[in-house]
């Protein structure tokens, strides 16, 4: 029973998890009270406190990466009911047998234990004797066991993972307290901060967080040291890597990793011939995007999931229709006992001997063998442009119509802006333009794998305004805002210094608002930072709003840098624009898109110092201006804002990039390819996401051009230039 409680909670909230609004698995009232400090701090006070000193986690010499899987108890019986969720637990294997089998079959080099106290200490000791590394998740230990265990294991111990412990606490009467995003973050971070400190004080070592939520940056800001996104329920694995890698660089963390919940959340049926191929692809993707620890959550030692429509689990007896049934002795007597003998005859469908579990182990074993032949690349991949995750962006990495930000459904009844809306849609806008998801699993949908035709990017978190212009300039040529942001004078100073220092900033009116209560549909000049005086950042002041404008177009009959020409319309827009008073010299400005009636600017290039701002001049979030059904619109168009993001991403290219045969732009084949370049290793990695067709690209590295043809699903490694520390475009 130890392993199923979290899974039941996660299963019921699968869709919401992908929107980062789900209840965390162990985040009940008891846990909240235990984690709530007596004297709470503000989030600013928390981030101002010195962080625990850490070093980069050393990687194994043999593979240079930790490849592992979860260790669960197998006690036999029905663990929960539900006509879609019935989950049976087989009897094979016992803990010790599993540890031994992992070492014998070389199913990776790491085990993630779910056990507690002396059992945990004994199993990790056994794993160490067999040459394996250990970590744990949700584990508890008393009487100094944790410290004694970690000191004994030394480098064989990787840290404690508190899993999906946290969510935003709207169980309190927030409405009468005047709910703000700031208040939610303060309460959230206080609980994380206290728990992380307790784990450190108990001697657990590095603290990890595994979660599908998009608020992982606030857990890191509160003291967590190793972010491990729960990949697959998170959604886009490439975007998840950008978040983990960005936090790794920003907070100088020991490492970042991935928790592959493939069995639960890959969601495609076994009848799809590429069901298991996607697990192999996930391992390759994480390897080539910089993860140094990859844990396969389940599937290889026994099956758990009921979220695959034709999983062998669906062939087990189903007697209890409601998942909400309290699973106690009476329930077992009623629902389990009558069919237990029948179920036992089918344990071979779901235990480690089953064909599906064997496939999982074979894929992990083969990937570990690959890593021993091709050790994971040193350092992190080059990522020279970033997506900004704005301050107080708590909604999620995409739009879910029925989801409320922070689960604030009560607040949303009075203020519908607490429901997902244009800020969350704007994440979809930027992702679809520069991180497309090809239909690689047809007829099933691909919701997990995005290509990188414009190269890898990081996510730069503005959580708590805890970021500096120095960090941004050392790492990113281009910084693009899309989703929610609450601006402040401190943040405005960072943005000004970034642009003056040479950065390219893509930002809009909405992102410079100081609103912290989701009142974004009622924008005013008074809510803008500096009262709308953006002279230092952009060279103009915002005086107010123009009348609504309905169509955008190019300013000239000659195509500009975005490819826009006059009379090719983008829209409908239906948006008021910023009424601007220009302060800087006229030559500092270039109008890139204007309205088709009076030529009021939609998008303006504002040159400033060594850098520039690509300014979105409408009173709403970017997605509001990306509808594209106007004169000249084509099927493959990505919208006005989409083209802006693509142009900016090209400005952010590093030493290595791919294009089509025009040598300038990614073509359709590039939209099926993930690539990365590791300057410390001197290698380029390319992965064709198309399982059925060759895909071609021009690999451009350090001025050279190579025409490549990747076979279906090919993962290719190419020698490149190894850079010295002062030559790299990212500061490690």
Locate each region found by the language model:
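Mature N-terminal, pre-catalytic/accessory segment of carbohydrate-active enzymes
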Residues: 18-20, 24-125, 133, 148-162, ...
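Aromatic-Pro/Gly-enriched surface loop or interdomain linker
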Residues: 50-58, 65-75, 81, 328-475
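Helical hinge/lid and interdomain linker segments adjacent to catalytic or ligand-binding clefts
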Residues: 92-103, 114-121, 125-128, 425-524, ...
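Substrate-binding cleft/loops of secretory-pathway carbohydrate-active enzymes
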Residues: 145, 149-152, 198-243, 265-274
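Active-site clefts of carbohydrate-active enzymes
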Residues: 224, 245-276, 302-305, 346
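Carbohydrate-binding surface patches
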Residues: 380-420, 474, 496, 600-632, ...
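A glycine-rich, often tryptophan-bearing local segment used as a flexible ligand/cofactor-contacting loop or short
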Residues: 485-570
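Catalytic beta-strand/loop cores that center a nucleophilic Ser/Cys/Thr
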Residues: 514, 546-609, 621-626, 652-701
């Amino acid at each position: 029973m130890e392993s199923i409680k979290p899974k039941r909670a996660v299963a019921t909230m699968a869709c919401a998890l992908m929107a980062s609004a789900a209840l965390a698995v162990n985040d009940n009232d008891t846990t909240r009270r235990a984690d709530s400090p007596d004297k709470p701090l503000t989030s600013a006070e928390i981030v101002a406190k010195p962080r625990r000193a850490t070093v980069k986690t050393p990687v194994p010499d043999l593979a240079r990466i930790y490849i592992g899987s979860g260790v669960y108890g197998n006690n036999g019986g029905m663990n929960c009911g539900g006509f879609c969720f019935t989950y049976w637990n087989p009897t094979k294997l016992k803990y010790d047998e599993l540890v031994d089998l992992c070492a014998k079959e070389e199913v990776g080099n790491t085990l993630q234990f779910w056990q507690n106290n002396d059992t945990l200490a004994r199993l990790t000791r056994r794993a160490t004797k067999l040459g394996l590394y250990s970590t744990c998740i949700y584990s508890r230990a008393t009487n100094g066991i944790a410290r004694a265990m970690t000191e004994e294991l030394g480098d064989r111990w990787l840290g404690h993972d508190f899993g999906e412990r946290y969510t935003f606490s709207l169980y309190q009467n927030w409405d009468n307290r005047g709910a703000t995003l700031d208040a939610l973050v303060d309460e959230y971070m206080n609980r994380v901060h206290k728990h992380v400190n307790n784990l450190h004080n108990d001697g657990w070592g590095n603290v990890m967080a595994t979660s599908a939520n998009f608020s992982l940056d606030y857990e890191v800001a509160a003291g967590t040291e190793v972010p491990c996104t729960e990949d697959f329920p998170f959604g886009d694995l490439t975007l998840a890597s950008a978040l983990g890698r960005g936090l790794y660089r920003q907070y100088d963390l020991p490492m970042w990793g991935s928790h592959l919940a493939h069995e639960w959340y890959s969601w495609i049926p076994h009848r799809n011939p590429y069901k298991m191929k996607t697990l192999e692809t996930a391992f390759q993707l994480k390897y080539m995007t910089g993860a140094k620890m990859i844990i396969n959550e389940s599937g290889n030692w026994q099956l758990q999931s009921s979220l695959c429509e034709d999983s062998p689990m669906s062939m087990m007896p189903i007697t209890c229709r409601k998942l909400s049934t309290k699973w106690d002795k009476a329930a077992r007597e009623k629902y389990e006992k009558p069919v237990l003998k029948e179920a036992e005859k089918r344990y071979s469908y779901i235990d480690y001997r089953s064909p599906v579990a064997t496939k999982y182990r074979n894929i992990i074993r083969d990937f570990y063998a690959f890593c021993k032949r091709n050790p994971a690349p040193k350092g992190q991949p080059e990522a020279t442009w970033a997506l900004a995750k704005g301050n107080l962006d708590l909604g999620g990495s995409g739009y879910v119509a029925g989801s409320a930000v922070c689960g604030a459904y009560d607040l949303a009844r009075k203020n519908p802006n607490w429901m997902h809306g244009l800020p969350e849609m704007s994440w979809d806008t930027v992702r679809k333009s520069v991180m497309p998801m090809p239909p690689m699993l047809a007829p099933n949908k691909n919701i997990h794998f995005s290509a990188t035709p414009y190269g890898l990017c990081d996510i730069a978190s503005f959580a708590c305004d805890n970021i500096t212009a120095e960090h941004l300039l050392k790492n990113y040529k281009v910084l693009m805002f899309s989703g929610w942001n609450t601006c402040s004078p401190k943040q405005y100073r960072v943005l000004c210094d970034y642009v003056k220092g040479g950065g390219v900033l893509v930002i809009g009116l909405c992102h410079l608002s100081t609103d912290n209560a989701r009142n974004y549909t009622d924008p005013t000049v008074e809510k803008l930072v500096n009262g709308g005086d953006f002279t230092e950042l952009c060279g103009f002041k915002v005086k107010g709003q123009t009348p609504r404008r309905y169509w955008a177009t190019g300013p000239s009959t000659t195509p500009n840098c975005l490819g826009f020409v006059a009379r090719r319309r983008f829209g409908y827009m239906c948006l008021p624009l910023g009424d601007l008073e220009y302060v800087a010299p006229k030559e500092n400005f270039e109008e890139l898109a204007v309205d088709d009636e009076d030529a009021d600017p939609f998008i303006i290039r504002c040159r400033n110092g060594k850098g520039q701002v690509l300014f979105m001049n409408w009173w709403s979030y970017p997605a509001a201006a990306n509808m594209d059904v106007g004169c000249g619109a084509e099927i493959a168009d990505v919208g006005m804002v989409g083209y802006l993001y693509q142009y900016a991403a090209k400005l952010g290219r590093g030493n290595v990039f791919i294009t089509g045969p025009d040598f300038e732009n990614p073509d359709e084949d590039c939209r099926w390819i993930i690539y990365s370049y590791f300057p410390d290793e001197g290698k380029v990695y390319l992965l064709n996401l198309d399982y059925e067709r060759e895909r071609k690209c021009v690999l451009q590295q350090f001025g050279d051009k190579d025409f490549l043809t990747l076979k279906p699903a090919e993962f290719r490694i190419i020698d490149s230039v190894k850079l010295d520390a002062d030559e790299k475009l990212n500061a490690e």
